[in-house]
Amino acid sequence: MATIKDVAKMAGVSTTTVSHVINKTRFVAKDTEEAVLSAIKQLNYSPSAVARSLKVNTTKSIGMIVTTSEAPYFAEIIHSVEEHCYRQGYSLFCVTHKMDPEKVKNHLEMLAKKRVDGLLVMCSEYTQDSLDLLSSFSTIPMVVMDWGPNANTDVIDDHSFDGGYLATKHLIECGHKKIGIICGELNKTTARTRYEGFEKAMEEAKLTINPSWVLEGAFEPEDGYECMNRLLTQEKLPTALFCCNDVMALGAISALTEKGLRVPEDMSIIGYDDIHASRFYAPPLTTIHQSKLRLGRQAINILLERITHKDEGVQQYSRIDITPELIIRKSVKSIL
């Protein structure tokens, strides 16, 4: 592997001159600069990122800590963040923790050692212990995104109440009166607010919520599958079902299909999130759209602003608003 000394020798200059060319820290004559760049290319020389960061005080890298990269919703946000980082000239180090405090601590220490310029932390829920841990790394510019009503973080307001209302309202407008729901864990903010939107739409339409048709999952496809199988053991079934995310809808559709039932002929289903794959479900899923692209872009823009102004004291917490939109496809039928 070539070193800076090899480059200097080939170009016929000092290592200091090579450093100035690489870091653009001092004027270098054009012919000298060209000789150095030619030597770098011929030797396939790559400067030490750590050594360079010590000189210019930046690694042009960002760390991201996220609950999981497996869930399609989070995977699409990560993709958006990575794309926007790349356009801004930054590399992204992404790690997952699955709500394990020890892993979070280890990841934070590792990213700090890599001298990342900033940190983006995106989890579905935070404990006070995890917030205290993050505060111990406060010297690193950081954006901590929270879907909950936390006063000590930046906030993602995805207007889940409005989205839950919008989904249920669409089912009602299609003539459905017997409506069930597979929600997330109701002790979690996102799940609870989507359910409250469902309640509001049902109340406005003067429709009764059947407690037997309210099932809790954990936003995974197997939860949709298991909840639908429990629902199908009942004597009376809803004509429509609101699944509070798209992957639970996928699991629910799979369970229905295994029993020889069809969507939407035997039961209409609406999802939530509008993940990329939802348009390729059988049938294509009617759902509630949330802009993952906009969320990722705004989160990084806030972080880059904090990196730029990191020496100016405490930054105000920010808020990102994501407006839900109804996407009509083929999984809901009108029974008017």
Swiss-Prot record:
List the Pfam families hit by this protein, alphabetically.
Answer: LacI, Peripla_BP_3
The answer to whether the entry has keyword Protein biosynthesis is no
Q: Which SUPFAM superfamilies match?
A: lambda repressor-like DNA-binding domains, Periplasmic binding protein-like I
Q: Which PROSITE patterns match?
A: HTH_LACI_1 (PS00356), HTH_LACI_2 (PS50932)
Question: By its UniProt entry, which InterPro entries does this protein fall under?
Answer: HTH_LacI, LacI/GalR-like_sensor, Lambda_DNA-bd_dom_sf, Peripla_BP_I, Tscrpt_reg_HTH_PurR
Question: Which ranges carry the HTH lacI-type domain?
Answer: 2-56
As for what it does, the entry says:
Is the main repressor of the genes involved in the de novo synthesis of purine nucleotides, regulating purB, purC, purEK, purF, purHD, purL, purMN and guaBA expression. PurR is allosterically activated to bind its cognate DNA by binding the purine corepressors, hypoxanthine or guanine, thereby effecting transcription repression.
Q: What is the name of the protein in this document?
A: HTH-type transcriptional repressor PurR
Say which species the protein is native to: Haemophilus influenzae (strain ATCC 51907 / DSM 11121 / KW20 / Rd)
What gene does the UniProt entry assign to this protein?
A: purR
